[in-house]
């Protein structure tokens, strides 16, 4: 299914996908498949606006989690693909962050189940960023981290990326 959807996207944008295909040949089979999943299901705006290396970081982190964390490996494929591997959370700028966040958080959640890890990641996020009201464009997760604050939606994008960076399936949900 991933390969089929990737080839369909590539057929629609041959000049964009030719260099992507060249770079995929240099990846391991697992990382190439993860990248193909991202490209198969990402919006055209992401394909056109971000370099391959950004998505490679998400793919490499996801594959590493799948290989090294038994809890992640036990996830149903659809959950892993959509809520751990996938790069997009909302309409935020996409920037490399997952590998960095995993390095920052990993030791704090060592040996924890998903529930315990989710709580610890939430504490880490609260330590790193606070609420700040603005009307600016939605920042990337790494920008919120570096700035130390963000709007409500930015904080949730930050938290979802932090959770996904360590293999905890997460998505953004709005509730009144």
Task: Give the label of every model feature segment.
Residues 107, 117, 123, 132-142, ...:
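Hydrophobic/aromatic-rich core segments of domains that either
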């Amino acid at each position: 299914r991933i390969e089929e959807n990737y080839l369909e996207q590539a057929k629609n944008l041959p000049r964009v996908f030719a260099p992507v295909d060249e770079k995929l040949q240099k990846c391991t089979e697992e990382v190439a498949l993860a990248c193909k999943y991202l490209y198969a299901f990402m919006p055209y705006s992401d394909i056109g606006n971000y370099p391959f290396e950004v998505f490679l970081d998400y793919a490499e982190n996801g594959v590493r989690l799948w290989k090294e964390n038994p809890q992640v490996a036990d996830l149903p494929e659809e959950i892993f693909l959509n809520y751990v591997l996938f790069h997009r959370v909302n309409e935020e700028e996409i920037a490399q962050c997952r590998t960095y966040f995993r390095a920052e958080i990993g030791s704090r959640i060592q040996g924890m189940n998903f529930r315990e890890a989710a709580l610890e990641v939430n504490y880490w996020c609260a330590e790193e960023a606070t609420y700040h009201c603005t009307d600016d464009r939605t920042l990337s997760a790494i920008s919120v981290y570096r700035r130390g604050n963000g709007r409500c939606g930015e904080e949730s994008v930050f938290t979802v990326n932090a959770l996904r960076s360590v293999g905890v399936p997460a998505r953004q949900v709005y509730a009144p």
